[in-house]
Amino acid sequence: PGAAYAAAVANGESERAWIRRVVLLLTGQAFSLLGSNIVQYAIWWWIVLQTKTGSAMLLATLFGVVPQAIVSICGGSWADRHSRKLLIMLPDMVIAVVTVVLSLSFAMGWASLTMIFVVLFIRSAGGGVQTPAVQSFIPDVVPSGKLLRVNSIYGVINSVNMIVAPAVAAVLINTVPLWSILL
């Protein structure tokens, strides 16, 4: 079992208390991932609608995906050596700050494709740190006999998210300004 789970049992905590922690973690991640992906897809939809060029969309996709793929290679080892909670929360805060800055830039008419690409890059790199940390954190709070089930639920959450987020973003981008979606 995970270290946090074993410590909780050693301190007399109910074995079923892990369920509360897992529900909080997975619920938080579900909403965080959904919001983050809606923002990502809304930005991509906005770029397509505004530029009408495949090259701008290609660059947006590269800046929005490649950094996460590269950073996540190291993200797993960082999660093994550093505080997983910090590696989950810190990138989330950085992502939130740069997204709010982009939102304000759109609201004030200052946004540019370059700024969007920089924000996509930062958001993607943050995801490359956060995602492996979450995946490494789950075994810490789940009994080993329940790990497969919880990981399966986490996988379903991610799969549903990948279906729902683009659709929600498409509806939103056609009904409200991008700056409000980013908030």
Predicted features along the sequence, with ranges:
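Alpha-helical transmembrane-bundle signature of multi-pass membrane transport and export proteins
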Residues: P1-L183
